[in-house]
UniProtKB/Swiss-Prot annotation:
It comes from the Eukaryota. Keywords: Cell cycle, Cell division, Centromere, Chromosome, Cytoplasm, Cytoskeleton, Dynein, Kinetochore, Microtubule, Mitosis, Motor protein, Nitration, Nucleus, Transport. Its main location: nucleus. Homodimer. The cytoplasmic dynein 1 complex consists of two catalytic heavy chains (HCs) and a number of non-catalytic subunits presented by intermediate chains (ICs), light intermediate chains (LICs) and light chains (LCs); the composition seems to vary in respect to the IC, LIC and LC composition. The heavy chain homodimer serves as a scaffold for the probable homodimeric assembly of the respective non-catalytic subunits. The ICs and LICs bind directly to the HC dimer and the LCs assemble on the IC dimer. DYNLT1 and DYNLT3 compete for association with dynein IC (DYNC1I1 or DYNC1I2). This is Dynein light chain Tctex-type 3. The gene is DYNLT3. Acts as one of several non-catalytic accessory components of the cytoplasmic dynein 1 complex that are thought to be involved in linking dynein to cargos and to adapter proteins that regulate dynein function. Cytoplasmic dynein 1 acts as a motor for the intracellular retrograde motility of vesicles and organelles along microtubules. Probably binds BUB3 as part of transport cargo. Required for the efficient progression through mitosis. The keyword Cytoplasm applies. One of its GO terms (biological process) is positive regulation of mitotic cell cycle. The lineage of its organism: Eukaryota, Metazoa, Chordata, Craniata, Vertebrata.
Length: 116
């Protein structure tokens, strides 16, 4: 039996397209807001859900993982890292960094190609 492999439009993950989608979602949720601990759960849930919805609507053969962290600005800063073991020709990631005067937001998108 011959196997058929579809590799996400044969060009790999479009990180710029994903970055633009996520940035719009973050701007829509956090734009104009000041840090408020009581709103963090709602904000982060909205950002990941909206981002995921828009990414899936692209209709590409990927499974997506979206993470979001929002932290209050302070003198201590904010550092994060991630690592993946995957097929770099078809899978990909993008990170969106967003900030205003009161908070920082980091959103990571991991896209894993679905091979059929």
């Amino acid at each position: 039996m011959e196997e058929y492999h579809r590799h996400c439009d044969e060009v790999g993950f479009n990180a710029e397209e994903a970055h633009n989608i996520v940035k719009e979602c973050v701007d829509g949720v956090l734009g104009g807001e000041d840090y408020n601990h009581n709103n963090i759960n709602q904000w982060t849930a909205s950002i990941v859900e909206q981002s995921l919805t828009h990414l899936v609507k692209l209709g590409k053969a990927y499974k997506y993982i979206v993470t979001c962290a929002v932290v209050q600005k302070s003198a201590y800063g904010f550092h994060t890292a991630s690592s993946c073991f995957w097929d770099t020709t078809s899978d990909g990631t993008c990170t969106v960094r967003w900030e205003n005067r009161t908070m920082n937001c980091i959103v990571n998108v991991f896209a894993i190609a679905i091979v059929l």
